[in-house]
Each structure stands twice: as structure tokens, then as C-alpha cells.
Amino acid sequence: MADSTKFVQTITDGYTSKGDYIVLGAALLNGVPQKEALVKLPLKTLNRHGLIAGATGTGKTITLQVIAENMCAKGIPVLLMDLKGDLSGIAKAGITNPKIEERHAALGIPFVSNGSSVEFLTLSKENGAKLRATVSEFGPVLFSKVLNLNDT
């Protein structure tokens, strides 16, 4: 119990900041979410560079969706480059299921499903509003996708 109290206090102290924030989740202690140890992302830090890294299936896309949805809910404009089409689902409200309900109950965070305001932009002739860019701004991967190049 003392370990739990010390852990929660350490996380709480580390994620305390002035101003508004986004809740990303709760810290885990021995695989158990600690409802009192919320992981908070201060809005004032969102003008810096960031990295979301991990192996396949570890929640990188979901983390980015949560950040983008919460920023939209707070009135902050978001521009996401979605080459794989994984993020467009934030336009519609999600559907709950027992796994989501169980996770939110364990975190002590209510599940609220809302669609976000989305405008689709495009660099190609696909559907969406044309996004202007110069060729020099493209990296090699994006440039090859725009030109529909293959490995040969």
C-alpha cells in the first residue's frame, strides 16, 4: 500500500502543471491502472515537437487520435498527415464495447464518444480540398506515393 501511495504521489507531482491539459490515461503499477495517477499533457507544451513510438499494436494511432480529439474539443486546430488513412475515423463518434467500458472504468475516466470536426485535404486528384505544397517540401516517401511509383 505504501508503494502504491508513493507511486501515485510521484506521478501526480510529475504531471502537475499550470493551465489546461489533456488527460491521456492513468499510470500503471504492476499492471493495474492507478485512477489517482492521471497522465496529463499540458496544452502549453503542444507547440513543441513530439514522438509517439512503439511496436505494431501498441496504441500509437489511438494515442494520436486521443490527442487530436481532445485538442479539437478544446478548440485547438489540428493538422494531421494521414498517409495510411488510419485517422479519418475521428470524424464519426465511436461505438462502445465491453472492452472500452472495462478500460474506462479501470481508469476512472468516463467514456464519451463524439465525432470531431474534420476537413479532408489532398495533395493528389483524390477527394478532398487541395492542399498546396511544393515538390521540395515532400520527402522521398511522400513524393513516391504522389507519383504512384513502385520499387522497380
Task: Name what the model sees in each region.
Residues 1-55, 62-74, 78-79, 84-109, ...:
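Basic- and hydrophobic-enriched, low-structure N-terminal and domain-boundary segments
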Residues 54-61, 133, 148:
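Short, charged/polar micro-motifs that form catalytic or ligand-binding hotspots
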Residues 105-152:
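Helical/strand "switch-coupling" subdomains that flank nucleotide/phosphate-binding cores, especially
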